[in-house]
Amino acid sequence: MNDFTFPENKTLVNNQLRNFQYTNGKFQHTIIDPQKPKDNQINIGGTDYFFINLNNSGKSKGSNSIILKLYESQNFDLEDIEYGVPDKILKIFSIPKASKSYLKRSLEKRFEKEIYCLDKCKEKKYQNVITIYESGTCKIFDSRRRVNKEYLYYTMEYSESDLKQFIEENSSMDFKNKINLCLNISKGIKELKSIGFYHRDIKPDNIFIIGETWKIGDLGLISERDEDDEIDKENEFIGPRGWITPEAMNKFLCEGKQLEFNYDCKLDHQSDIFQLGKVFWYILQNNAPVGVFKHEDFQLKYNKLYPIVRTMLNYSKKRRYNDINEVIKLLEPIEKEIQLT
């Protein structure tokens, strides 16, 4: 564990890290000033870092997390302040530890499980899941209650772009790179499955490019195969809206109710395959399959791909692929064929 404490003039306001000062009997909050790096310094595992918000507005990606860029202070020129590529990303769970709320405690358990899964992937030296570095507890001053509170955190590698942003900026990506991208993501799902985890939140925003490799990140909704301690609540809406699976919608609408018919409400590896099919469609032709669709809706003229994606997107798990290995084995010959043309 690598615990640390934020500077005394930092606090959380609406899930955003802010400066604060006590003036005329009132606390005043201001956005962190990137031009004063010495005011924004922390030490993690014996290394000093300057930190800034992920974006200029201070808003973080993710409703339950604070995301900061970290820069090693020894490599930083204080005479010519310029923020380039960060050394790491810091992700902090925005709810204090030891909360008495059942909902907040459940969210904390999910963050702990995310860290556990990323640590397992790091141990295995997996290549298509985001790499974690340190994890532990950090202290941030609560300016309202005037006490330090503890928050879970972890650091990870920096990504230049997520899939959504990348496709919007590279809409003319060639077919070879699209297939390589689909394979990278599939291998990430395979890596998670090999250690007994399902992602359950596969969408373009949670897929990141590191160098030339695509990796899966944001494991906040992962589930462990055959787990005894079930975090999910009955009728909970699990997964990204717009990329939702049939069984996730069944869980939300039907679970635990005395209905005329029985529906599959279990989110598992085949649910990941369904979501991945939607992401493949988005990669291949830049939109998403919604409602009833046919072969003519698939605008790509390469005929070997549509049957693969269509099988992944079947409503019933019985008609989907059982394992992501089946998808990988179908994509690899296509990749080789393209390389020869």
Segments and roles (model prediction):
Residues 1-56:
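Juxta-kinase regulatory segment immediately upstream of eukaryotic protein kinase catalytic domains
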Residues 66-116:
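ATP-binding glycine-rich loop module of kinase domains
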Residues 122-144:
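Conserved HxN/HPN-centered segment at the entrance to the catalytic loop
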Residues 146-162:
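Conserved short submotifs of the Hanks-type protein kinase catalytic core
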Residues 163-173:
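AlphaC helix of the protein kinase catalytic domain
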Residues 181-182:
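Activation segment signature within eukaryotic-like protein kinase domains
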Residues 193-209:
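Catalytic-loop of the protein kinase fold
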Residues 210-243:
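Activation segment/activation loop of eukaryotic-type protein kinase catalytic domains
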